[in-house]
């Protein structure tokens, strides 16, 4: 049933004690449909390769990289340790990544690594940041080096997670 709880997703506790959010089938399916509708003009079904440096136990990665992209037929490359910046860069060089999600901290670390500017970003169509505010300076540098806007989204665990996301063309307000 659409209103049945499908998962108890625990919050990060950034605003207090970690809580178990009860997410329903309807929550997750609605978020997947919203994500796919938002990305439809930039991605081709069953042709994309996504880079997922965020852990799947985090609602952002679980919904966007796992559920939405699998339902889109995308191949998802999991990064076991995103703090190992060389391994993230290696995945960019190994696969023609078309979509990446991450946090401002990760994008900044990648931009500051000397090998990052040697990557061919011609296949990168969408980069989405969440989990924290995206700094304008990081977004500007990301666009200058990769040619792809760094799009900021906002959400909460309780909302499965997306509430609002900037336009993919980079025209939205950062931070």
Predicted regions and their residues:
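Conserved pre-ATP/AMP-binding loop-to-beta segment of ANL
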Residues: 1-10, 17, 42-49, 159
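Structural detector for helix-capping/boundary residues
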Residues: 3, 25-26, 54, 95, ...
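Conserved S/T- and glycine-rich ATP-binding loop of Class I adenylate-forming
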Residues: 5, 11-14, 50, 56, ...
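Conserved AMP-binding A3 loop
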Residues: 6-33
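Short beta-strand->loop structural element characteristic of the AMP-binding/adenylate-forming
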Residues: 19-22, 52, 75-81, 151
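Conserved AMP-binding/adenylation subdomain of ANL enzymes
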Residues: 29-49, 59-99, 113
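Conserved AMP-binding
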Residues: 53-59, 132
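Gly/Ser/Thr-rich phosphate-binding loop
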Residues: 74, 97-102, 111-174
């Amino acid at each position: 049933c659409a209103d049945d709880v499908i998962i108890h997703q625990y919050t990060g506790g950034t605003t207090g004690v970690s809580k178990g959010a009860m997410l329903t089938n309807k929550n997750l399916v609605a978020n997947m449909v919203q994500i796919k509708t938002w990305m439809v003009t930039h991605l081709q079904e069953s042709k994309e390769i996504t880079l997922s440096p965020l852990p799947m136990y985090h609602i952002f990665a679980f919904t966007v990289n796992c559920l939405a992209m699998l339902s889109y037929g995308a191949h998802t490359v999991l990064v076991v340790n995103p703090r190992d910046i060389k391994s993230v860069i290696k995945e960019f060089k190994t696969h023609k990544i078309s979509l990446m999600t991450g946090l401002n901290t990760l994008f900044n670390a990648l931009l500051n690594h000397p090998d990052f500017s040697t990557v061919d970003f011609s296949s990168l169509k969408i980069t989405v940041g969440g989990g924290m505010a995206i700094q304008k300076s990081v977004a500007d540098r990301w666009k200058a080096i990769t040619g792809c806007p760094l799009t900021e989204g906002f959400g909460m665990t309780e909302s499965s997670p997306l509430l609002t996301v900037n336009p993919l063309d980079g025209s939205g307000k950062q931070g």
